[in-house]
């Protein structure tokens, strides 16, 4: 193996591993059609992001949101990320946004119509709900999969930076 090839075979996997844990640059509209950028969301505060891509995701987000609002420190930003790439073309986007407004009126829910940000942030395909914790710089600290339970809530809270 050449002197150049060996360092590259080591560097590329490391670069991908680091990229998977850091928030990617994005601009997505929320359910109110307000644009949010990666810089807006990760603006010097810890972020708990609830994400999913199934029909029941808004219900699961609502349950997590309620529990997080009770137990997470007020300095933590709680946001949703809805992967909507699988929505059939004939379903009006406005009906999905209205449903999100109704279920999560006081929470930013980013609408990822192409599923690219969802994938780049490392959320699993086919997930009803996953909850990730990011530090103030957008570094992912961990992901908890599944509906809210006391055990999963404890896992999420343990991931929050001090």
Give the role of each language-model region.
Residues 1-7:
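Positively charged n-region of N-terminal signal peptides that target proteins for export
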């Amino acid at each position: 193996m050449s002197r150049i090839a060996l360092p590259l075979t080591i560097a590329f996997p490391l670069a991908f591993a680091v990229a998977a844990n850091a928030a990617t640059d994005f601009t997505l509209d929320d359910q109110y059609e307000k644009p949010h950028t990666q810089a807006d969301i990760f603006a010097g505060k810890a972020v708990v992001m609830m994400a999913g891509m199934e029909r029941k995701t808004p219900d699961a987000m609502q349950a997590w949101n309620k529990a997080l609002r009770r137990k997470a420190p007020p300095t933590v930003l709680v946001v949703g990320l809805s992967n909507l790439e699988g929505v059939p073309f004939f379903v009006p986007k406005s009906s999905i946004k209205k449903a999100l407004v109704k279920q999560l009126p006081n929470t930013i829910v980013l609408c990822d119509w192409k599923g690219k940000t969802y994938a780049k942030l490392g959320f699993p395909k086919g997930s009803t709900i996953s909850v990730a914790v990011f530090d103030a710089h957008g570094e992912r600290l961990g992901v908890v999969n599944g509906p809210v339970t006391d055990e999963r809530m404890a896992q999420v809270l343990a991931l929050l930076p001090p």
